[in-house]
């Protein structure tokens, strides 16, 4: 899942820096998560439900804050597959970042250590996950 700031049409994306206590410490991803057994229903994986559960757990944002872009984007990097759901926000990236940081501050051990705003490749460090960079390059070249 990725959050794109559509209010100012600046192409900004919000990325989460994984906390030091996580298996992916310091890696930068879209605020999202892995599928877990609670996402498996009737032998199928509920990716849509996973997106909303994870976004709420990691950022405190919900359906009142975000609008889904239709469809999914799929990125293949070697043996890995990432399914990405783009979400549009009415608030600016800066305002959303502050809201998410305030939400994270209430958690004793938040999964994310920080939120980064990416509007162009220069905003991305070498810690950004390869599938995220692949998606961002595609999104920026098509906007």
Which functions belong to the PLM regions below?
Residues 1-3:
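Conserved small/polar residues in nucleotide/adenosyl-binding loops
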């Amino acid at each position: 899942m990725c959050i794109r700031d559509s209010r100012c049409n600046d192409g900004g994306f919000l990325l989460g820096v994984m906390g030091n206590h996580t298996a992916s410490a310091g890696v930068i991803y879209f605020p999202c998560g892995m599928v877990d057994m609670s996402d498996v229903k009737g032998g199928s994986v509920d990716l849509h439900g996973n997106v909303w559960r994870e976004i709420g757990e990691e950022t405190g944002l919900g359906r009142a804050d975000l609008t889904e872009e239709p469809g999914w984007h799929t990125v293949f990097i070697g043996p890995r597959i990432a399914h990405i759901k783009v979400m549009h926000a009415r608030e600016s990236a800066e305002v959303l970042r502050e809201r998410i940081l305030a939400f994270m501050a209430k958690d004793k051990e938040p999964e994310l250590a920080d939120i980064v705003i990416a509007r162009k490749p220069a905003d991305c460090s070498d810690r950004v996950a390869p599938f995220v960079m692949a998606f961002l390059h595609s999104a920026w070249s098509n906007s």
